[in-house]
Swiss-Prot record:
Ranges annotated as biased composition (Polar residues): 1-11
Listed name of the protein: Biflaviolin synthase CYP158A1
Domain of life: Bacteria
Keyword Transcription regulation on entry: no
């Protein structure tokens, strides 16, 4: 990293701002990020862990430009201790998140068939069956029920496990590992133990599926390894983040339901116009802050100009999809939830070649959860005052920890 960075206009670079990991009780926007957005389109930040500082892009057009620009890469991030949110950082070979082209496309091809629109459409009846069984359970027992524990957690686990090809007997163990990996509360040692457990299990599973013709992800990876298209280490590194991905659906929908349960006008709108829920879900996806801070950095592979500022080769850059989704130049009155907002080109699932692999699957699960809970629980409401709902702490993915409801 360069010792001094100057703008192309000769002005001094923006100051480096500390960005602590905040535990926010509720869906409110991160106040530090809001301040950084006001400061300018390109700022510099220092996160709780790692070394040095990084650039932060918050404007919609800049976020799209950077995430589409091959002059910014991810592969080098794995070799450096860049300033970051997570206390532990040991990426594995094969992870799509850190692959640059052409490796990214080669790896993604190995599993793409499991995440197509067609594959997701075929899965939908089975997913609905799983969800109906969970709702049947809480209806049989009667209210109150914690929707996070009883529905929002087990449903994505079961659906992702169907897609991945996880045997039913292993599903709870796999979920326990994923929970520990994405938490920031257990420390590096606990996360590393969970990673060893999960990736050891994945290695055994991929080996066992060698030569398989199945349509699940582990069978696809076993077959791809057998054909020499990906290495075993790459297959394991590719599968891990896909297995963990169900956590995002749990907590995104948890935030959506919290908003509907605490803002009567939103719930009324969703119930009165079920045919327009697709547009409404897009707006909720745009508005919610699905994560703490920012995700994964990129490295400038050569000098790049952004907003009149020279980002030097070797300097790290973060983009904020949360900030981009609140850009007033793209989303008028961006802090207001407008369930009729159209067009709504939100970036909730990312952008560029790192666009979420499971976006179609995640969207399908989100639609089923919201539709089914609203239709089968017509009197759905919180069982406790809103301020008593516990929110997740020391974690990268935001959302209510519990959602006690009655109906």
């Amino acid at each position: 990293m360069t010792q001094e960075t100057t703008t192309l206009t000769g002005q001094s670079p923006p100051p480096v701002r500390d960005w602590p990991a905040l535990d926010l009780d509720g869906p409110e926007f991160d106040p530090v990020l809001a301040e950084l957005m006001r400061e300018g389109p390109l700022t510099r930040v220092r996160l709780p862990h790692g070394e040095g500082w990084a650039w932060l892009a918050t404007r919609y057009d800049d976020v799209k430009a950077i995430t589409n620009d091959p002059r910014f890469g991810r592969a080098e991030v794995t070799q450096r201790q860049i300033t970051r949110l997570a206390p532990h950082f040991k990426p594995r070979p094969g992870s799509l998140a850190f692959a640059d082209q052409p490796d990214h496309n080669r790896l993604r091809r190995a599993v793409a068939g499991a995440f197509t629109v067609g594959a997701t459409k075929r899965l939908r009846p089975r997913a609905q069956e799983i969800l109906d069984g969970l709702v049947d359970g809480i209806l049989a027992e009667g209210p109150p029920a914690d929707l996070v524990e009883r529905v929002l957690e087990p449903f994505p686990i079961a659906v992702v496990s169907e897609v991945m090809g996880v045997p039913a007997a292993d599903r709870e163990r796999v979920h326990s590992w994923t929970r520990q990996i994405i938490s920031t509360s257990g420390g590096a040692e606990a996360a590393e133990r969970a990673k060893r457990g999960l990736y050891g299990w994945i290695t055994e599973t991929v080996r066992a599926r060698a030569g398989s013709e199945g349509g699940d992800v582990y069978s696809m990876l076993g077959a791809a390894v057998g054909r020499g298209e990906v290495g075993e280490t790459e297959a394991v590194g590719l599968a891990g983040p896909l297995q963990i991905g169900g956590e995002a659906v749990t907590h995104n929908v948890g935030q959506m339901l919290y908003l509907l349960l605490t803002r009567r006008e939103l719930m009324a709108r969703m119930r009165e116009r079920p045919g327009a829920r697709g547009t409404a879900l897009d707006e909720l996806l745009r508005w919610i802050s699905h994560r703490t801070s920012v995700g994964l950095a990129r490295i400038a592979l050569e000098d790049v100009e952004v907003h009149g500022t020279r980002i030097a080769a070797g300097e790290p850059v973060y983009v904020s999809y949360l900030a981009a989704n609140r850009d007033p130049d793209v989303f008028p009155d961006p802090d207001r939830i407008d369930l009729d907002r159209d067009p709504n080109p939100h970036l909730a699932y990312g952008n560029g070649h790192h666009f979420c692999t499971g976006a179609v699957l995640a969207r399908m699960q989100t639609e089923l959860l919201v539709d089914t809970l609203l239709e089968r629980l017509p009197g759905l409401r919180l069982a406790v005052p809103a301020e008593q709902v516990a929110w997740r702490r020391k974690t990268m993915i935001r959302g209510p920890r519990t959602l006690p409801c009655t109906w």
